[in-house]
Every structure is written in structure tokens, then in C-alpha cells.
Amino acid sequence: MMRVGRTLANKKEIVAELKERLRESQMALVIDYQGLSDAEMKDLRQRLRKCNASCKVTKNTLMELAVKESDTWQPITQFLKGPSAFLLLKDDIGGAIKAYQEFQKATKKTTLRGGVMEGRALDEAQVKAIGDLPSKEQLMAQIAGALNAVTAKIAIGIKEVPASLARATQAIADKGAA
């Protein structure tokens, strides 16, 4: 039986879709997905979807065509060796990296080749460091807590000025009466 490959039009469509997905992404990771079952791949996609990220499996040559004219994504070409899956991260980068790391720990079947962010190639250690950063929600909570503490201290300070003035006035009055 002869196997029919993708048509040129179909390949162009895939490249256009990859370009669009990359345009929407802040970071891309390249993993070796060899050995994953369909169920495991579905599990990975579901974990990533919760963080507004996606997993795209495509031929390396099609990804090369998609990034050819983009300085931002060009460094990804150095990771295109063997079967590749592309994790495209949009908003919650830290959450998506953590989701992948948890998946990797559970299956022990994938390896992270590297990633690209803002036109820079990242190795596994750099990707892990980004994943260890607090999420946007955690940072907002920390900032809100810090602002709340500052306003509380200001309020206490403002309240303390008249109270100390009153105590000083009372001390002078007591001293004068004695």
C-alpha cells in the first residue's frame, strides 16, 4: 500500500497556523515526545490548556518554514532534531512550565530540548528558572499585600501624630499645674 504524503497546500496551511500560534505566544518549548501514548499526549494537552498553552506536533521542516522570517522565533531551529512537539505558551508561562514538569515527572517519557523567549534560546536550566518564578496571580497578591501593609502603617502614623501631640500638651499642662 502506498502512503500519500501531505499536499503542498496542506503544508502551507500548517505553516500559516504555526505562524499564527507563534504570534500569539510569549514562549515556545521543544520537547522530544517519543514514546508517549495517545492517552498521555491527551493528558499533556489538557494540563497545558488549563494554563492557556497548547501542544502542537508537527514536522521539524514545517516549523523551520514557520520561523524562517521571524527573528523572535528563529533560535528554535537549533532544537529541531528528531520527533518534536512544540509547547506554545501564551499568558501563564510559569504555570504552563510547571504543568509540563509535573507531566514529565509523572510519565518520565519526555525530554525538554530547550525553549525560545523574546528571541533568545533557553536551555533546560533557564526554562526551569522561569518556571520557578511566582505566577502573575501570586505576584499581584504579594504586591497587594505590600501595598496594604504600607497604607496600614501610614494610617497608624497619621493617627499617632495627634495622639502624641495631645500627650505632649497634657504633659505640659500637668507640669504647669504642679
From Swiss-Prot:
The gene is rplJ. Belongs to the universal ribosomal protein uL10 family. Forms part of the ribosomal stalk, playing a central role in the interaction of the ribosome with GTP-bound translation factors. One of its GO terms (molecular function) is large ribosomal subunit rRNA binding. InterPro entries: Ribosomal_uL10 (IPR001790), Ribosomal_uL10-like_sf (IPR043141), Ribosomal_uL10_bac (IPR022973), Ribosomal_uL10_bac_type (IPR047865). This is Large ribosomal subunit protein uL10. Part of the ribosomal stalk of the 50S ribosomal subunit. The N-terminus interacts with L11 and the large rRNA to form the base of the stalk. The C-terminus forms an elongated spine to which L12 dimers bind in a sequential fashion forming a multimeric L10(L12)X complex. GO terms for biological process: translation.
